Amino acid sequence: MRKVFITGTAGFIGFHLAKLLLSEGFRVHGFDGMTDYYDVSLKQRRHQMLMQTPGFSATEAMLEEAGKVSETIAEFAPDVIVHLAAQAGVRYSLENPRAYIDANLVGTFNIMEAAREARPAHLLMASTSSVYGASEDMPFAEALKVDHPLTLYAATKKANEAMAHSYAHLWHLPTTMFRFFTVYGPWGRPDLALFKFVDAILDGRAIDIYNHGEMYRDFTQVDDLVRAIRLLIDAAPALVDARQEAIEGDNLSPIAPYRVVNIGNGQKVRLLDFIDAIEEALGQKAIRNYMDMQKGDVPATWADTALLRALTGYAPRTDFREGVAEFVTWFRDYHRK
């Protein structure tokens, strides 16, 4: 039975990934600090559901606790490490920057140090589409230069990519970084747009729409996203072999078993169309408050998913209208009973 160590299992994406892997017979050990960035009861409920599943165990501790991180990983001896835990959110990084240094830099360093000792077959870590900054070269391909982050959050994730490459090179640790694009779905975070919009519309409150609605996002349904991660677990990078046929667009490092992979839906959706889908699912119109662009935000994101497809055969299954309707059903069941 393969063993996977996942950080952030009480979080949105980590919860869904753990569920998927457990359903396939993996043993999963979760590691989560249960921080109060948002409603802790939502995190606790996710973990309670996982704890009822055979094969799951968990440790509650902070990423910054180096000793606890290394001790837990050494004891579990995972075949694979998936590092998803982080201080998330572009906008919150403007208010509380130190949290991003502690969790995203120090915490990620602790994971990499523990991985260096534990020697898993594959280390996979979350980056973000925010590293592409204000680039207008769309769709965003992994080979694009990402040297101009617009927020500290994006900067810490860019730093994580550089740190991971150095460890992959120095210690021959097969490493994949994934850049996520606007993830949504059931059990989502309260600070994400879909959650906030549905909550406000049901309460009769106005929703803030930035850049006067001229926003586009590559909305990625969470089940599609964790399925992509599952496929990538079995696609560990190896050192370049001149005898192997190169994959077009591959950014595999020439000096390390390391690559970066976008995980997105592969299409950009106008925010106003997304809001229309929410209204349709709710059967209720939104009160729309159009606003200027917010500091640190970008008008559009759009993932080039050709590399992900070439490596794994992945294709998204969820149309955003279906995904929104599914979220609304969950929201009403969980929050509005």
Regions found by a protein language model. Give the residues of each.
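Hydrophobic alpha-helix immediately C-terminal to the catalytic Tyr-X-X-X-Lys motif of short-chain
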Residues: 159, 163, 167, 197, ...
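Alpha-helical hydrophobic/aromatic positions enriched in membrane-embedded helices and signal peptides
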Residues: 3, 24, 31, 88, ...
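N-terminal Rossmann-like NAD(P)+-binding domain of SDR-like oxidoreductases, especially those catalyzing
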Residues: 1-183, 232, 318, 330, ...
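C-terminal substrate-binding subdomain of Rossmann-fold SDR/epimerase-dehydratase oxidoreductases
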Residues: 20, 61, 201-337
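Short, conserved catalytic or interaction motifs in soluble domains
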Residues: 39, 186, 265
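Conserved sequence/active-site signature of Rossmann-fold short-chain dehydrogenase/reductase
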Residues: 131-132, 183-185, 215, 225
